Design a protein with these regions (language model features):
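Short S/T/G/P-rich N-terminal loop/turn motif that feeds into the first structured element of a domain
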Residues: 1-232
Length: 232
């Protein structure tokens, strides 16, 4: 079975006052069109901490690269989509820059699923992006995660909902993973338990022995799901 693909979109705002207009458009105009043209699970978040704020972060999911191309072809041919974009771009712009990356799920990633009716909304998501110096060293990073790090995550109360490699986008090679938390306190406690685990220290040392410094830079983003996000 082909690995799922993800589209990460960051919409950078120039002013905080643009946020309400952009979120309203995403909920009322864009989301129904995404659903009409059979896009997969979708997440929409405000960026609370990240390289660029204020910003809106979106995740679109596809079962394959071919289906991603087909979904956007259907969207681009829809006159309602053209009208919605024209409405958004009328008068003052709702954002000043769009950054898009395409990612492919790793072999050890769980499927990214929408929340079921009645599921509680997580207060916070953490997106972590690990940059490796080379593709070979990214492979060692995969080995470390699949070889024990994920199990240690779960024992510490850290439960990522996806792991994916960027195939089109900046700072490649890199791997991203997304973690839901009930609160900032939950996050701090879980990471403290993980960091203090001697097995983690041993696993990290072994990965460095095998592949050198396999992670050269880490980018963190704290995301808050919107009321209309399917991933919440």
């Amino acid at each position: 079975m082909a690995a799922p693909y993800y589209e990460f979109v960051v919409l950078r705002l120039q002013f905080g006052s643009q946020m309400g207009r952009l979120l309203g458009w995403l909920e009322k105009r864009a989301l129904p069109l995404f659903q009409k043209h059979r896009f997969g699970s979708m997440g929409f978040f405000t960026v609370e901490v990240g390289p660029h704020i204020p910003a809106v972060f979106g995740i679109l999911t596809y079962p394959s690269f071919a289906e991603m191309d087909a979904a956007w072809a259907r969207m681009d041919a829809d006159h309602d989509y053209a009208a919605a974009v024209a409405e958004l771009e009328k008068d003052e712009p709702a954002f000043y820059r769009e950054d898009t990356s395409i990612l492919r799920a790793t072999s050890f990633s769980p499927p990214l699923k929408p929340a079921a009716p009645g599921d509680p909304m997580h207060k916070l998501y953490e997106l972590r992006i690990y940059e490796s110096p080379t593709q070979r060293q990214l492979g060692y990073l995969h080995d470390r995660f699949a070889g024990g790090e994920i199990e240690m995550f779960h024992k510490s109360g850290i439960h990522p909902v996806l792991y994916a490699d960027t195939i089109i986008g900046p700072n490649r090679p890199n791997m991203a993973y997304l973690i839901p938390f009930e609160s900032e306190a939950h996050r701090e406690k879980a990471w403290a338990v993980f960091r203090d685990n001697p097995d983690w220290q041993q696993l990290r040392a072994e990965s460095i022995r095998r592949g050198g410094e396999i992670v050269r830079n880490i980018t963190n983003m704290f995301l808050v799901p919107t009321s209309f996000s399917m991933i919440r």
